[in-house]
């Protein structure tokens, strides 16, 4: 069900919500996207919606955009009972002719979602507001990546004509800077979101001692040289995740070699491959057997969040690991 299906819904009374969901049930929708500005700001409507979906839609996945200012612990508790992703717009705000980015608000909302173990995504924009610049966009991206969102979306890279958030050249954001921002955004969309990198991204970034935006800028250049950048027409969501994983590992090896950290790359490769196998099991139901150089118990432990310490303290142990769907969810065993 597309966001366009909500265009005729206004007011969000209990009856209108019931009617909308009844249409979803008749259509046997398995994934429903909720994208409505008025709804996103209406806490009471969001709670009504969540309670109804918990009761009547146990097998449907909902992607629900909620205004950060409306999100609170009560909504998080209600959302925790259904299969969903909460989508948040992290935007610049304006007051008295100045723009600002409310890091305190956004970090608190992300903390609520992480505490409730909810999947959430963040939507970022660039050059759509007076006062924005390439530097402030990169700052927002760096800030967002550190909040552990499941995905970071950039609607402006999905369509050349974005009516909601059109880009425009200003004294602070040149046409060349807009192209750079677009390429960085597309690189993030490919590597982080399509690459399902959230479990390990910050861990592999730490030894490189660079910010996320710098990493994605370098990956954007790697994509350009490989003819899989924005201008090439490459669509990362249409590529099997296993192929994105190969791209990730190829680029990460380049970066680790560049920083003279080749001795750490075996750890990185094992962490990426094991987490990738779990991602494909969850996303595509794909069971597999992979070869690892370390015990999977170690690779999935908190110690793996510090790549350098892991390499120094954990002994290598060749394993054949089966990734499979267990009775209580994704599981693994050493063969």
Please annotate each region the language model reported.
Residues 17, 26, 34, 52, ...:
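Weak global preference for isoleucine
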Residues 5-173:
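Conserved non-cysteine loop/helix-boundary elements of the Radical SAM core domain that shape
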Residues 166-199:
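C-terminal accessory region of radical SAM enzymes
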Residues 186-335:
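Radical SAM enzyme core and accessory elements
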């Amino acid at each position: 069900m597309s966001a366009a299906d909500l265009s005729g819904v206004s007011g969000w009374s209990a009856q209108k919500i019931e009617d909308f969901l009844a249409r979803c049930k008749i259509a046997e929708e398995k994934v429903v996207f909720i994208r409505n500005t008025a709804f996103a700001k209406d806490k009471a409507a969001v709670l009504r919606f969540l309670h109804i979906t918990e009761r009547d839609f146990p097998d449907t996945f909902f992607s629900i955009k909620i205004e950060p200012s409306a999100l609170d612990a009560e909504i998080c508790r209600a959302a925790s009972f259904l299969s969903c992703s909460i989508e948040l717009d992290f935007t610049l705000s304006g007051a008295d002719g100045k723009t600002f980015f409310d890091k305190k608000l956004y970090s608190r909302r992300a903390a609520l979602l992480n505490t409730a173990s909810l999947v959430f995504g963040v939507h970022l924009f660039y050059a759509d507001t007076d006062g924005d610049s390439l530097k402030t966009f990169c700052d927002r991206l760096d800030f967002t990546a550190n909040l552990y969102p499941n995905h970071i979306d950039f609607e402006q890279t999905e369509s050349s004509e974005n009516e909601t958030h059109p880009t425009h050249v200003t004294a602070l954001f040149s046409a060349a800077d807009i192209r750079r921002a677009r390429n960085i955004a597309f690189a993030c969309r490919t590597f982080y979101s399509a690459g399902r990198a959230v479990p390990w991204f910050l861990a592999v970034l730490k030894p490189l001692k660079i910010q996320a935006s710098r990493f994605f800028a370098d990956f954007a250049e790697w994509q350009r040289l490989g003819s899989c950048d924005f201008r090439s027409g490459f669509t990362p969501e249409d590529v099997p995740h296993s192929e994105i994983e190969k791209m990730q590992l190829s680029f990460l090896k380049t970066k680790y070699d560049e920083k003279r950290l080749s001795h750490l790359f075996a750890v990185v490769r094992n962490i990426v491959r094991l987490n990738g196998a779990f991602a494909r099991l969850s996303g595509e139901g794909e069971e597999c057997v992979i070869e690892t150089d370390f015990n999977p118990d170690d690779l999935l432990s908190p110690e793996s969040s510090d790549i350098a310490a892991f390499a120094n303290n954990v002994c290598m142990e060749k394993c054949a690991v089966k990734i499979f769907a267990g009775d209580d969810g994704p599981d693994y065993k050493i063969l």
